[in-house]
């Protein structure tokens, strides 16, 4: 049997390779790292997480991304299995030790007899064979040119920013305290998963002034892409209004200062554990495009981080994606060249889990085709199916932008109360329907 080739061993490519091999079809995984480096990656491991170590909410009852976690587990997904194995305390979220996680994904794929690795860059889209393009937000310039040449698209892109990581030993715990927002979590470790840095109004105003005045990385001439709203740099949020951050990543709600319970902070900066040892913490929601020297100066203004030592500073990178509603069919194939499938962030989904989910589907669909079968996508009533439906036709091609999974992509339920007050009934009804429909889809595959 001819193998299926995958370009890119990120979360989507790794998941696709796993699904193809589990279906009994040989697969060749092409990865340019570490021979060809990128701005954000540090290793040549599969599924390296560069922006954050969080897969977001793990609540499969009230949250669409939590439901997506459930669906990927139900489908035997490698990414979720390794995330569960290497999870860290994070309240109601699923966060992982990113190095242990990516190493585990790599080892699982290396141990799979039907998966073979072929290192090196693919600079042109192949004209024959069965291929999945899962090159992610940091698609190489050469392959990007090949994709644009084939699709006739201009450079569709937005900018992603990366948050800094702090050495835990440099955090002043006489000022900070450990608590998850609203004390979420079933164990004491979960309920104390975050380190909180309190700010008075004076602290906050001084921080905003320094943030707005800091030197920023300038874009190259001709780079006019915008930002994805879910990953805005903090200085861009501050430019939208001085109180924006206090109602975003720095909101003080659901937290009580353990050192002074009677004093309510005006704003709070949260840090989340980044590795199993608890020696590294990332600053939650603090993506930035400030220059390195400015980052150190500005972030050390945060109470408790005045002596902070940084394991990694923030940065910014360009993220390329296809106009999928115009170019991709619901089997994730390029309409003009059906032997090419696309998966992951390059399709216009946003987020680790969403990218891996598209890899899962692309892998299963490619394997089914290689075995002489046709596999339709899951119903649009599921998180996975809602994403596919959105990127392959539900969204307007003229205004298409990357999208996280959310209940707004689900078909509405009849006779359910709308608005904010109806959520406590509506969201569980969505996820109950999604679970039943997804289980039926998985059962129909076999």
Swiss-Prot record:
GO terms for molecular function: flavin adenine dinucleotide binding; tRNA (uracil(54)-C5)-methyltransferase activity, 5,10-methylenetetrahydrofolate-dependent. GO terms for biological process: tRNA methylation; tRNA wobble uridine modification. It comes from Paracoccus denitrificans (strain Pd 1222). Its EC number is 2.1.1.74. InterPro entries: FAD/NAD-bd_sf, MnmG-rel, MnmG-rel_CS, MnmG_N, TrmFO. This is Methylenetetrahydrofolate--tRNA-(uracil-5-)-methyltransferase TrmFO. PROSITE patterns: GIDA_2 (PS01281). Its cofactor is FAD. It is found in: Cytoplasm. GO terms for cellular component: cytosol. It catalyses: uridine(54) in tRNA + (6R)-5,10-methylene-5,6,7,8-tetrahydrofolate + NADH + H(+) = 5-methyluridine(54) in tRNA + (6S)-5,6,7,8-tetrahydrofolate + NAD(+); uridine(54) in tRNA + (6R)-5,10-methylene-5,6,7,8-tetrahydrofolate + NADPH + H(+) = 5-methyluridine(54) in tRNA + (6S)-5,6,7,8-tetrahydrofolate + NADP(+). Belongs to the MnmG family. TrmFO subfamily. Keywords: Cytoplasm, FAD, Flavoprotein, Methyltransferase, NAD, NADP, Transferase, tRNA processing.
């Amino acid at each position: 049997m001819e193998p299926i080739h995958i370009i890119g061993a990120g979360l989507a490519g790794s998941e696709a390779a796993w699904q193809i091999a589990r279906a009994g079809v040989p697969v060749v995984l092409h990865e340019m790292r570490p021979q060809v480096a990128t701005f954000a990656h540090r290793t040549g491991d599969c599924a390296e997480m560069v922006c954050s170590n969080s897969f977001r909410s793990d609540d499969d009852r009230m949250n669409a991304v939590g439901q997506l976690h459930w669906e990927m587990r139900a489908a035997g997904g490698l990414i979720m299995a390794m995330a569960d194995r290497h999870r860290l305390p994070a309240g109601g979220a699923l966060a992982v030790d990113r190095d242990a996680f990516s190493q585990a994904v790599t080892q699982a794929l290396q141990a799979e007899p039907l998966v073979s690795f072929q290192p090196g860059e693919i600079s042109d889209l192949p004209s024959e064979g069965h291929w999945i393009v899962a090159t992610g937000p940091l698609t190489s310039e050469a392959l990007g040119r090949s994709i644009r040449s084939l699709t006739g698209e201009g450079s569709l892109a937005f900018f992603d920013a990366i948050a800094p990581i702090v050495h835990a030993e440099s955090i002043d715990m006489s000022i900070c305290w450990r608590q998850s927002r609203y004390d979420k979590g079933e164990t004491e470790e979960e309920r104390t998963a975050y380190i909180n840095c309190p700010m008075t109004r004076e602290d906050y105003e001084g921080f905003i002034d320094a943030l707005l005045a800091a030197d920023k990385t300038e874009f190259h001439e001709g780079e006019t892409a915008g930002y994805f709203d879910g990953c805005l740099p903090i200085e861009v949020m501050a430019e939208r209004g001085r109180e924006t951050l206090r109602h975003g990543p720095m909101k003080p709600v659901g937290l009580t200062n353990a050192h002074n319970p009677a004093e309510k902070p005006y704003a709070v900066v949260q840090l989340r554990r980044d590795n199993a040892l608890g020696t590294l913490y990332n600053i939650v929601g603090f993506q930035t495009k400030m220059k390195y020297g400015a980052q150190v100066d500005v972030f050390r203004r945060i109470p408790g981080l005045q002596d902070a030592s940084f394991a990694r500073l923030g940065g910014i990178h360009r993220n390329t994606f296809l106009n999928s509603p115009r170019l991709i069919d619901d089997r994730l194939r390029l309409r003009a060249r059906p032997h090419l499938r696309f998966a992951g962030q390059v399709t216009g989904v946003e987020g680790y889990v969403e990218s891996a989910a598209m890899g899962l589907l692309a892998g299963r669909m490619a394997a089914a085709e290689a075995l002489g079968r046709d596999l339709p996508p899951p119903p649009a009533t599921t998180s996975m199916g809602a994403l596919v439906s959105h990127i392959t036709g539900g969204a307007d091609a003229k205004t298409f932008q990357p999208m996280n999974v959310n209940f707004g992509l689900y078909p509405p339920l009849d006779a359910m109360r709308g608005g904010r007050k109806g959520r406590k009934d509506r969201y569980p009804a969505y996820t109950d329907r999604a679970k039943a429909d997804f289980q039926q889809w998985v059962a129909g595959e076999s």
